Amino acid sequence: MRIGIYPGTFDPITLGHIDVIKKSLKLVDKVIVATSYNINKDYFFTIDERIEIIKRSLYKDLKLNKKKIEIISFDTLTINLCKKYKAKIIIRGLRAVSDFEYEFQLAGMNKKLSNEIETVFLMSDIENQIISSKFVKE
């Protein structure tokens, strides 16, 4: 079974995130949507609220397959999460070229930490690319 981890804060989840999740289901058998807590960020929603919003968005509203999508929280390195769940793919969404520099560096660091885990970049559809969680909160 090919397992992918889609890490993020998802504060809140956006249509762009959902688009990336749907596209990733074409590449892997199971996607683990992993919402994290970063002490350097100010959050609008608690971790439990974010998980509930993600579940409602994916399972109830969109009726996506619960067997193919697992929603968890985590507070460790993404690489450690991949090893725990035997995931070989880290899924990252890109909205614009401005996202690429940071994501490229992150993918390089993850590759150094574990050569067997690949990072896959997915673009959301154009109508969802300009929406960030920051703007949804505002």
Report the location of each language-model feature:
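Nucleotidyltransferase catalytic core that binds NTPs
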Residues: 1-138
